[in-house]
Regions:
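Helicase P-loop NTPase motor core
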Residues: 662-706
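Pre-Walker A adenine-sensing motif
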Residues: 495-513
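ASCE P-loop NTPase helicase motor core
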Residues: 509-512, 516-674
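Conserved, well-folded catalytic cores of nucleic-acid-processing
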Residues: 471-478, 537, 559-562, 605, ...
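Core RecA-like ATPase module of SF1/SF2 helicases and allied nucleic-acid translocases
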Residues: 525, 564-568, 650-653, 688-902
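Extended low-complexity, intrinsically disordered and solenoidal helical-scaffold regions
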Residues: 2-218
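Conserved adenine-nucleotide phosphate-binding loops and their immediately adjacent elements
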Residues: 482-495
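N-terminal accessory nucleic-acid engagement/regulatory domains that precede
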Residues: 117, 123-126, 130-136, 141, ...
Length: 902
């Protein structure tokens, strides 16, 4: 046995021993000890496979370094190089982002399987014999689903049909799954245009290891599998080709030359795409390879080509990267991702930037170039996995500290992170000082890290909290003179208007001592109804109604039908285009979803006499940091706070019992859910409609019980007339949701519900008739590219518009034509503020870790009458036992009081 083989097998023995000790709850493979063993294992294998000397010494450090450079140039060993790169990074860096641990474990398992297969087939060397004990999550339903898909991938069905589709696609996610220790992939993708909706996704399956960095073209065929009594159509990828959009290469070239000159119909482009496809090498790796390898690849690609402009640009870029000049981190990320909409946001179209190597890059990119792990590009927040793949982490440790604190604040609503929670970092004071010194001078006040007592925080977040609270306190110093008597007269004149004593008392006291009112209440307690009463009370005054989402705004518009009212989303109000800011009263609904930054901007921009803030701290929170609504009542007088308790949404006492127990995390949550029949096994009844007003809610888009598959199941059972548009199928009577494409905005807004009522095809277009969940008149539709053709039986408007069959993904102005998505099922987040007679919620073990208390409570309270929660008994126990309320409000409020003398 050679020395290198012995080294490999010795490392293998240690790894197998560790694998045998792991279980599902122990992510022990992420420990530094195991990472060190894995690194040695991979490096020994690289030395064996890349050396021409069979007696290579495994302990020769210089030879190891040399051979690892060779590894980077070996297309057949790309997986080994990527695994080594992954192991070079600290696992703690990867786990800074949500669900990163699970993704990391899947990556390890995938790479280890590839190593075992490769060494067995190529070297007749048997390693990792107990790989089946590796701790990845498994589920019987998912196993059956994956086995059926794998069978279709491995055995081409005679009934399958190839899809004639040649458009470019963006890969959103590739998730491996494993059947009989063979690797397959679930690939989620969208059309490659600049405005494609992130919700308009398609899933396909393959055994091919596809590079996910760039736009691609797929050869796809359809097949069918059976899940229970249901047939499901699946897409299978037979082959793939990298196909970077020419506009992306043009815009990348513009960064260096200030002009665009790349075409997709030239030899260099074709050869480069073939090289990327065959070797799965991304452009960043190519441009950072050793000189001899780069030059040899370049020579092959540009051979016989008349136009070599692309490689002239690459040569300039390569020099910047090799010398780590200003702008190199921006270029690294752009080379790694090549996404047109991201790239365009970074370009300075009217000149160059001296501070960024005189490239055509905006000065606003500079913070990212200097601190890529703690700041964002213009209009884009990179994922931690992508950053770690393309930018070295050396000399960036202070950024990971800042990222940890920011993530803890935004994800967990912890404004002040305890120093004891930062044990993974050493020399914290030095890191804080280093981070603050690196900040751009205009960002020092807002983004700097501060210490107070035993906590560390980001200055801007604490300052925003303080300013919001101070404004609220100012509004509580005095009330409206004569207010209570004014309300009493109105109540006397409208004796049957209010049938809830709590609302009546709230109305009588609301502005007697304050100019701001906080209205808290669980789902269905009539918060919107109270808004209506207050609005009618002040019918003569000018009023502004704000909410974060279009459905919430439209709900207010339907609820409040009096004069002197404006309705808009928070984003629209804060837009520079909006100049109307003065109102007598401002109402903000679903306040818990509003981040502190936006709340502060509203208070700065809006001029008002009375402010009414309405919401529920137990429902879905702000995507960005937003704790103002939960901590405000700890600072303001009780006379400004009103809690609604009586539930009116449902008359079902059992349902209200479950809502209450979940809201308050009481004992007996599970018993009530099971006893009242709300808990269901994952079975075919998911797809059987029980009520005309019914919705299926999912947390994720992918997987067996994700939105995409549920939509596919239910659409398959729709016998309506159909049309195929690229990779999508649309049928008459499909429910739809309009997306954020802005094609018909603002009149047809994001999340507006609709139903396809007719479809017609011409040679060049598809014409859709859509019934929309609102009523328009002809004046509303002027200047829009759709036609108002009538009304449905229930009065809703029906509109008609066409889409071009031909999709162009080459150009900068390529836009997705279809402005809606199929919506038999929707995400729980999209359902906030909506209610249905019947609600089905699907929770598989794939998503159980992402089910928070707020998300679960929001989901179950969408139901008026019937509720069905589909999950396995094991998942039910784990979800309910892991529900926690975020309890940082009192601690954060206490520190704020001391820090700002509030």
């Amino acid at each position: 046995m050679t020395a290198i083989d012995k080294a490999i097998l010795d490392a293998d023995t240690n790894i197998c021993k560790n694998i045998s000790k792991f279980d599902d709850s122990d992510r022990g493979l992420l420990s530094q000890n195991i990472l060190s063993q894995l690194r040695n294992f991979v490096e020994y294998i690289a030395m064996k496979l890349c050396s021409t000397n069979i007696n290579v010494d495994p302990n020769n450090y210089d030879e190891r370094v040399r051979l690892l450079k060779v590894l980077k140039t070996r297309g057949d060993l790309r997986f080994l190089y990527k695994f080594h790169e992954l192991l070079q990074k600290s696992a703690s860096h990867y786990t800074l982002d949500e669900n990163a641990s699970e993704r990391l474990m899947l990556k390890y398992y995938e790479y280890l399987l590839k190593i075992r297969t490769y060494l067995s087939q190529i070297c007749n060397l048997q390693v990792l014999k107990n790989i089946e004990d590796f701790p990845i999550d498994t589920d019987n339903d998912m196993n059956e689903y994956h086995q059926k898909i794998a069978e279709k991938i491995d055995n081409f069905s005679l009934s399958s049909g190839t899809i004639n589709y040649n458009e470019r696609l963006y890969i959103q996610k590739i998730k491996p799954f494993f059947v009989n220790e063979k690797i397959y992939y679930e690939v989620t993708f969208t059309l490659a245009t600049d405005n494609v909706s992130k919700f308009d996704r398609v899933i396909a399956f393959t055994s091919l290891d596809i590079l996910e960095n760039y736009a691609v073209k797929f050869s796809i065929h359809k097949d069918m599998i059976s899940i229970g009594n249901n047939k499901m159509e699946i897409l299978i990828i037979d082959s793939w080709q990298a196909s970077i959009r020419p506009c992306e290469l043009n815009n990348f070239g513009y960064i260096f030359t200030g002009k665009s000159e790349i075409k997709s119909n030239n030899l260099v482009y074709d050869n480069l795409m073939n090289f990327i496809s065959k070797t799965a090498t991304n452009l960043l790796d190519l441009l950072t390879c050793p000189d001899d390898f780069y030059n040899s690849v370049k020579a092959i690609i540009i051979e016989r080509a008349k136009n070599t402009a692309l490689f002239d640009i690459f040569d300039v870029c390569r020099n910047i990267l090799k010398n780590n000049l200003a702008g190199s981190n921006i270029l690294r990320y752009l080379l790694y991702t090549m996404n047109n909409s991201i790239m365009k946001n970074q370009i300075k179209w009217d000149g160059t930037c001296e501070k960024l190597s005189s490239l055509h890059l905006s000065y606003g990119c500079k913070p990212f170039d200097e601190m890529p792990f703690a700041t964002s590009l213009i209009g884009h927040n990179p994922r931690i996995f992508d950053l770690l793949d393309c930018i070295p982490t050396v000399n960036h440790e202070e950024e990971f500290l800042a990222r940890f604190i920011k993530t803890n604040t935004e994800r967990n609503n912890v404004l002040f992170t305890k120093a004891s929670d930062l044990e993974a970092f050493e020399n914290i004071d030095d890191l804080i000082e280093s981070y603050n010194q690196k900040l751009y001078y205009k960002h020092v006040k807002t983004r700097s890290l501060k210490e107070f007592s035993d906590s560390i925080y980001i200055n801007e977040y604490a300052d925003d909290c303080s300013e919001i609270i101070k404004k609220f306190k100012d509004l509580t110093t005095a009330g409206l003179k004569g207010y209570t008597a004014f309300v009493q007269v109105w109540l006397n004149n409208n004796p049957d208007k209010i049938d809830d004593e709590i609302k009546k008392q709230a109305l009588l006291q609301m502005f007697s001592n304050s100019h701001v009112a906080f209205i808290y209440g669980s789902a269905g307690t009539g918060k919107s109804t109270l808004i209506k009463h207050v609005s009618e009370l002040f019918a003569a005054q000018s009023k502004l109604y704000l909410a974060n989402t279009n459905p919430a705004v439209e709900n207010l518009r339907r609820k409040v039908t009096i004069a002197n009212c404006d309705y808009m989303t928070v984003a629209k109000f804060l837009s520079s285009k909006n100049s109307k800011t003065e109102y007598d009263m401002v109402f903000i609904d679903e306040s818990s979803t509003l981040c502190n930054s936006d709340m502060k901007k509203i208070l700065e921009k809006a001029q008002f006499k009375l402010l009414i803030l309405v919401g529920d701290i137990y429902q879905i929170e702000a995507i960005q940091f937003g704790n103002w609504f939960s901590i405000a009542k700890l600072f303001i007088p009780e006379t400004s706070v009103f809690e609604l308790e009586n539930t009116f949404r449902s008359t079902e006492e059992n349902l209200k019992t479950v809502w209450s127990r979940v809201r308050n995390l009481e004992e007996g949550m599970q018993e009530a859910i099971d006893k009242f029949g709300y808990s269901k096994r994952l079975d075919n009844s998911i797809f059987e409609k029980n009520n005309e007003d019914e919705i299926i809610l999912c947390l994720n888009y992918d997987g067996l019980y994700g939105i995409n598959n549920v939509n596919s199941f239910l659409q398959y059972n729709n016998s309506g007339k159909s049309v195929v548009y690229g990779i999508h199928t649309y049928k008459v009577n499909d429910p739809v949701l309009f997306n954020e494409s802005n094609r018909f905005s603002p009149i047809i807004y994001n999340n507006l519900k609709g139903i396809i009522r007719n479809i017609e095809e011409t040679e060049e277009t598809i014409v859709f008739d859509i019934e929309i969940d609102t009523v328009l008149n002809e004046l509303d539709t002027l200047d829009y590219s759709f036609e108002l053709i009538g009304n449905s039986e229930n009065g809703n408007s029906i509109i008609r518009f066409s889409v071009n069959k031909k999709i162009n993904t080459e150009d900068d102005n390529a836009m997705a034509e279809i402005p809606f998505q199929i919506a038999y099922a929707v995400s729980i987040h999209k359902a906030q503020g909506l209610e249905y007679n019947s609600v089905k919620i699907i929770i598989s073990d794939e998503v159980e870790e992402r089910i928070t208390h707020n998300i679960f409570y929001t989901a179950i309270t969408r139901a008026r009458k019937k509720l069905y929660i589909y999950w396995s008994p094991e998942v039910e126990v784990r979800v309910l036992s892991n529900l926690r309320r975020k309890t940082n409000a009192k601690r954060d409020a206490g520190i704020l009081k001391s820090l700002y003398s509030l």
